[in-house]
Amino acid sequence: MANEMEFEKPILELKSKIADLKEYNETSDVDLTNEIEKLEKRLAKLESSIYSNMTAWDKFQVARHPERPTTLDYISLLFEDFMELHGDRAFGDDAAIVGGIATFHGIPVTVIGHQRGKDTKDNLHRNFGMPHPEGFRKALRLMKQADKFGRPIICFIDTKGAYPGRAAEERGQSEAIARNLYEMSDMKVPIISIVIGEGGSGGALALGVGNQIFMLENAVFSVISPEGAAAILWKDASQAKKAAESMRITAGDLFELGITDGIIPEVKGGAHRDLNAQAEEINKTITKSLHALMAFSEEQLIEQRYEKFKKIGVYDTL
């Protein structure tokens, strides 16, 4: 089957066998109902075993799945009256980042996120979700607007990283990312960041200075891809599996390290299996987080955000 992952092969083989038996059962005089029921029970156990024991590399594959829901998929289900806003008012628009104003259960909010493409043409248009400086500056423009009008900011993170091309560097890629980090740290409104797929390095951090940061269960967050790390450490990109295990990139790892504030459960097999169910899980998390943060004063929001990031990386205190 297309877009299925290596670790799912035993599941797919058993599903195929069950499908063949069901087809044969409908056209023959032999009753295979009992055999089919046994295989379906075996399939349920196999799925439970495989999906509950996924390695970091397995989760990385799920995070990169071509059918994984994108920012716009979630926006259409989670928010009302979304109006997309374009451009950074300096150079141009960047389709790798989408953003605009909307309402969330009646609360006016600003929503921003990385946007991958759905097919080859769309991916080329959106640069595979890797923003140029104008994308980060567009995001910052929308954040400043939200800060001015008192709208909470909700960010969806899903990028391999900021685009490393020459033109992007010439237009100030590193400055654009650094500026976002600087400005976000002093915003007077609640900021919620959710890693829905890949959280790649500075490209992810530019939308990640939140009062609360969450990750979907199979999302990843790292300074470099496993392939890139393997190429540097072992001069061999084929060692990506080994690198993924060493880098501590999973939602569980990041929560344990105190970098994120929670893990959003995923539907069995990954978010791409059931978009509506996955959106509902995200809805619960945003609702709870937003109501908690909206009780803070402006000064408390800034202080809480500052203290949160100051504690990251602390091993011990005297």
UniProtKB/Swiss-Prot annotation:
It catalyses: N(6)-carboxybiotinyl-L-lysyl-[protein] + acetyl-CoA = N(6)-biotinyl-L-lysyl-[protein] + malonyl-CoA. GO terms for biological process: fatty acid biosynthetic process; malonyl-CoA biosynthetic process. The keyword Lipoprotein does not apply. Keywords: ATP-binding, Cytoplasm, Fatty acid biosynthesis, Fatty acid metabolism, Lipid biosynthesis, Lipid metabolism, Nucleotide-binding, Transferase. Its EC number is 2.1.3.15. Transmembrane segments: none annotated. Component of the acetyl coenzyme A carboxylase (ACC) complex. First, biotin carboxylase catalyzes the carboxylation of biotin on its carrier protein (BCCP) and then the CO(2) group is transferred by the carboxyltransferase to acetyl-CoA to form malonyl-CoA. Acetyl-CoA carboxylase is a heterohexamer composed of biotin carboxyl carrier protein (AccB), biotin carboxylase (AccC) and two subunits each of ACCase subunit alpha (AccA) and ACCase subunit beta (AccD). Belongs to the AccA family. This is Acetyl-coenzyme A carboxylase carboxyl transferase subunit alpha. The lineage of its organism: Bacteria, Bacillati, Bacillota, Bacilli, Bacillales.
